[in-house]
């Protein structure tokens, strides 16, 4: 949506909402919001955006890992990307999946979760649950914005948390 709404203290140029239907049968599920990507104009004061995000989420973490929902054809690896804090890149994360998944049900969760996360296997499940977070936020601008954004942006993503809620049903 092209917009000039104010988010995190600055006017935006575009806000994109991504929805996903987690019901694998398609019979009863409704799409749920899993990600919001916010693009800011070139002249936006991204230091203000970062400070406003710090008010909401606390200090930036040193790094976070996000897992993509898509793989390249023929690629069976777990598609992951690690974002490391820099002058123009701040990152936040919620609880790790390992902290919320009951240890006595880990195998059950892993078996079901494989249908939701490309490249996830028994071999990488433990590492995945340690690094994946219920929700993440990224504020990237200037030289750090590409390739996530074409320019200044914020990304709020909660796909793992949504899958967790679906699997625990």
Per-range role (PLM):
Residues 1-28:
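Compositionally biased P/S/T/G-rich terminal and signal peptide-adjacent segments
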Residues 1, 27-169:
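Non-cytosolic coordination micro-motifs
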